[in-house]
């Protein structure tokens, strides 16, 4: 799992993304007395893409989608899995700047995950 997180961070970094934080969901749940399998949520931020949404009053409502996230988790079979929002699909629900930004993010995620995720 750690290797997968590192590979995602490295691939994302090559495209200009930073990782502001990784949430340890297993640890968070344990602090509440709940046991779950390992699960982490990595936040990815591309400053230039986020800026396009944040600078526009018309598009700022989409900041709830920022930063973009990737979940890396284990299942009972012991294998590591990765999931993320389909930003390319989400872009079809949008207009203007948000549509283009999320289309770009979707394309970036395809590139980031290539070679990391097996179909």
PLM feature spans:
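Feature detects long, helix-prone N-terminal segments enriched in hydrophobes
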Residues: 1-119
């Amino acid at each position: 799992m750690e290797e997968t997180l590192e590979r995602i961070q490295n691939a994302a970094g090559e495209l200009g993304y930073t990782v502001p934080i990784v949430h340890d969901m297993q640890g968070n749940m344990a602090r509440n007395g709940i046991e779950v399998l390992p699960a982490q949520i990595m936040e990815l931020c591309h400053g230039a893409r986020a800026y396009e949404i944040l600078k526009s009053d018309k598009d700022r409502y989409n900041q709830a989608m920022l930063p973009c996230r990737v979940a890396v988790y284990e299942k009972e079979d012991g294998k590591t899995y990765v999931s993320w929002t389909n930003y390319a699909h989400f872009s079809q629900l949008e207009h203007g700047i948000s549509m283009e930004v999320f289309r770009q993010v979707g394309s970036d995620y395809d590139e980031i995950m290539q070679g990391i995720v097996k179909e």
